[in-house]
Amino acid sequence: MSTHPKFTRVPSIRDRVQDTLSAHRNELISLLSRYVAQGKGILQPHNLIDELDNILGEDHATLDLKNGPFGQIINSAQEAIVLPPFVAIAVRPRPGVWEYVRVNVFELSVEQLSVSEYLSFKEELVEGKSNDNIILELDLEPFNASFPRPTRSSSIGNGVQFLNRHLSSNMFRNKDCLEPLLDFLRVHTYKGHALMLNDRIQSISKLQSALVKAEDHLSKLAPDTLYSEFEYELQGTGFERGWGDTAARVLEMMHLLLDILQAPDPSTLETFLGRVPMVFNVVILSPHGFFGQANVLGLPDTGGQVVYILDQVRALESEMLVRIKKQGLDFTPRILIVTRLIPDAKGTTCNQRLERVSGTEYTHILRVPFRSEKGILRKWISRFDVWPFLETFAEDVASEIAAELQCYPDFIIGNYSDGNLVASLLAYKMGVTQCTIAHALEKTKYPDSDIYWKKFEDKYHFSCQFTADLIAMNNADFIITSTYQEIAGTKNTIGQYESHTAFTLPGLYRVVHGIDVFDPKFNIVSPGADMTIYFPYSDKEKRLTALHSSIEKLLYGTEQTDEYIGSLTDRSKPIIFSMARLDRVKNITGLVESYAKNSKLRELVNLVVVAGYIDVKKSSDREEIEEIEKMHDLMKQYNLNGEFRWITAQTNRARNGELYRYIADTKGAFVQPAFYEAFGLTVVEAMTCGLPTFATNHGGPAEIIEHGVSGFHIDPYHPDQASELLVDFFQRCKEDPNHWNKVSDGGLQRIYERYTWKIYSERLMTLAGVYSFWKYVSKLERRETRRYLEMFYILKFRDLANSVPIAKG
């Protein structure tokens, strides 16, 4: 007799809390009372776990509580809101999945909360009990209800693979779903030139017969026969240019399409769409900071993003040229990096309208000024103050792009909050495929900056920024991130995008469904380092030895100037090296302090940091000024002279590359101690140069580095442990010099496998093709979302932007 499996309902969080109350009543009351005793406020995960551990110390019988279902709840809780006698807990069983529960500690009652109810309760921390039951809520879930999406957390960030499976499955099940592909190929033109198909092919059946006829003709030709020699025959059959430059490539492309028409599969569909000629003109938005090629790195708001984009466009132009040639076309690609023109350019080229990017032929920086009713803004302003200028900037940029390209771009890429908002405005206006790259979403960098947004408003204007981020990420056709963590965090930490799923700005609006991290628009595409500048220290023939004298002066000079202070007395010691902007999040002063406090580390190694200004009078950045003052205080307090060298921000990338290698010659290490790092370009640079790397476990570096194999993870919130890890490494290297080589080689292997610009550019171009097709197929469904976002922009964002004081100058 066969038995059928018995299915049981997975208990909700509420059920598990209720069951725990029944089984461990006294222990749970003791724990919850401890939470309530801390008073009104927000408890972080470590607070919740610490109190659970504390009651274990009092009574070992409570071990069952910790190891049981309630212990699992506490370990997956991201925060708890305490408003005595209530404790509301936000539980995240796995990335992207949330539940909310509230316990009345006095009455021992438990209730499950909706997102809206939880956020309403949280708002009472700031607003008190509100009588207003009608609050503006942003909810994008209804617009996405019919959209396909994966359900497993492991699928997050692999959006294009899921989309290809969905599209090919639909085509396989329903041949009518092939019609949009035919229409897509038929409407393909560029500046009046028909591409792919002409009007002779009006149906799928005619397409199939034309492909078979073309296949028969092409198979008789030599594989390297140029397209021009058989162009006329193909045109008469219904085919235009774009299939390939030789008979072999055209035949391969046509075989791909025949396979799709006969039995679609995800891999074939992606390969085909990736090769269809779609992208000839690209616009990349990056308005804030000093965007230039020389003398800008280290200036306020100017760092890794500039390096990222300049490396990106070089790789992208190269990939576009290769693809256009292989497609049998003779079009000239154009890439425009659109940024702000700054008349008072501080000795940079940021006051020039057009500047060709070195190492490219067809890529330029196009600068457009910020302007208001008072005229053109001449001076730099903080990225936090740009909001009143962006709408007018977008209008001016549209005109400048049209003049420069003589057409609309095919693809727009936004960078950071301001660039992504401008990209959204342009893509919406032009009907162009839009890609979003956040680099860093500020909401995760400043804890509780949503619930207590009013405290941050005068300095940071986060109400504008968070609103702009929501609009841009939902308007984008696809989003690329450098790491999984940017999207959905880790088992225990929230991702940058995930933090925008549900949050509240009390008194402004409440987000009950801001973004879905399972959305197939998310893709992980990791950048690399420019390998003409960053290459292994062991590559002796390429080493820039002519720079060694200037590097020695930087590191070992005794002169105290505005460019460098401190000194290194013992040149035989390895060097710990760090290079970053001098702000709170980058935590350079934290590294200096942990080094200063560890006498064993000071005995083993020297410390060199390249960061910001040394003279506080030279900085106009609020955070940098505080960090400069702190650095000077640390030098005096711990008497670091002789073991520590502080060098101002260096803008010569070639010398910076050789600086990494010079540090490697000392058998030193690179340390990236940030409290949070979205990706970690300097980590990739250091590893590419063969320098053993220690980097924050909060953010991207945790994915780049395999702990103990290709580098080491450090926790900036536990600096003593981080410094001991460094002591252990250098002590082992002293005893076994091969240990240093092993870690160095492990880092290089990791880079070559995952983090190169060639891999990046190939992937980005393929994504542009697939999502352009998806945009064409799903245009009706996306239209509702965009109209909703447009209303939110006009009715909410505009007022917020207009409330930001207009910068003078």
Swiss-Prot record:
EC number: 2.4.1.13
InterPro entries, per the entry: Glyco_trans_1 (IPR001296), Sucrose_synth_GT-B1 (IPR000368), Sucrose_synthase_pln/cyn (IPR012820), SUS_EPBD (IPR056736), SUS_N (IPR056735)
Source organism: Pisum sativum (Garden pea)
Family the entry assigns: Belongs to the glycosyltransferase 1 family. Plant sucrose synthase subfamily.
Biological process, per Gene Ontology: sucrose metabolic process
Family matches, as Pfam families: Glycos_transf_1, GT-B_Sucrose_synth, SUS_EPBD, SUS_N
Alphabetical list of Gene3D superfamilies matching this protein: 1.20.120.1230, 3.10.450.330, Glycogen Phosphorylase B
Protein name: Sucrose synthase 2
